[in-house]
Swiss-Prot record:
Superkingdom of the organism of origin: Bacteria
InterPro entries according to UniProt: YolD
Species of origin: Bacillus subtilis (strain 168)
Name listed for the protein in its UniProt record: Uncharacterized protein YozL
Amino acid sequence: MMLEQLIQLKQDLIDGSKVEKPSLDDKQIDEMDILVSEALEFNKELKFKLFNKGFVENVTGRVHYINFEQQKLHVKDQNDNTVYINMNNIIRVIYND
């Protein structure tokens, strides 16, 4: 019984930390598209804020490929690992100055 209560308490804490996905308007989406395209062309580093199952994650890296068919960006992070970002999960993009 104690283990079940602990598991439930932990799940309640996780659920309480979740946020709703912000909605983006067309202008914000267009601005992010331009920023990503420019970063790809000029090899600039970007900071992405991503929505993932109720939580916000940060990824910093350079866009190496845009897969329009799968709606994913291939990003090389600062450790030279490839991160695949679902375009629908992006909630903010800025240059990493």
